[in-house]
Amino acid sequence: MSKLAAFNFQQWIDEHQHLLKPPVGNVQIWENTDMMVTVVGGPNQRTDFHDDPVEEFFYQLKGDMVLKIIEEGKCHDLFIREGDIFFLPPHVRHSPQRPMPGSIGLVIEPKRPEGAKDAFEWYCFKCDGLVHRVEVLLKSIVRDLPPIYQAFYQDEQARTCPQCGELHPGKEPPQGWVTLLENKEQDKS
């Protein structure tokens, strides 16, 4: 008899709902596979930008999210609405923002090639300069990220912008940094 079996994804989400909100916010469905399949719940906001050496696939199952992206040195918002999918190429700096309570997204990414490092970057809210960058061999999003964030939040020197001297706020973004447009038609322009 085969040990392989399908399962009801919605039932799995319902059973893990308590983990899909702060402070945990996300759960990997399978461990020790060549794919990181992660379910992420909102509300969840962060101030870092991820430099991922591999592609990421986003599917927004419930609610809306904003993926802040840095392209050509400029930050802009990419709205991923309920039911939308998005494919992010490697090394595009991005910061997933899920301000809606109860929102749920699925993020799938391949295992990193041997020795490939992920990086996490924080930018100055005043001058847009790079404040701090940390590189890591990422094995588990759920286990590996919290210590990286905590180290940055607690280190005032790491949070001081080398360009203008502004102190990065750490965990909490400035008010208004993340907004979901009221008029969803504005997304299409």
UniProtKB/Swiss-Prot annotation:
Cofactor annotation remark: Binds 2 Fe(2+) ions per subunit.
Enzyme's top EC category: oxidoreductase
Residues engaged in binding substrate: E56, R98, E109
InterPro entries assigned: 3hydroanth_dOase, RmlC-like_jellyroll, RmlC_Cupin_sf
GO-annotated molecular function: 3-hydroxyanthranilate 3,4-dioxygenase activity; ferrous iron binding
Tree of life domain: Bacteria
Record: residues binding Fe cation 2: C124, C127, C161, C164
EC number(s) reported in the record: 1.13.11.6
Pathway(s) of this molecule: Cofactor biosynthesis; NAD(+) biosynthesis; quinolinate from L-kynurenine: step 3/3
Subunit structure: Homodimer.
Family stated for the protein in its record: Belongs to the 3-HAO family.
Chain's role: Catalyzes the oxidative ring opening of 3-hydroxyanthranilate to 2-amino-3-carboxymuconate semialdehyde, which spontaneously cyclizes to quinolinate.
Entry protein name: 3-hydroxyanthranilate 3,4-dioxygenase
Record organism: Shewanella woodyi (strain ATCC 51908 / MS32)
Species lineage: Bacteria, Pseudomonadati, Pseudomonadota, Gammaproteobacteria, Alteromonadales
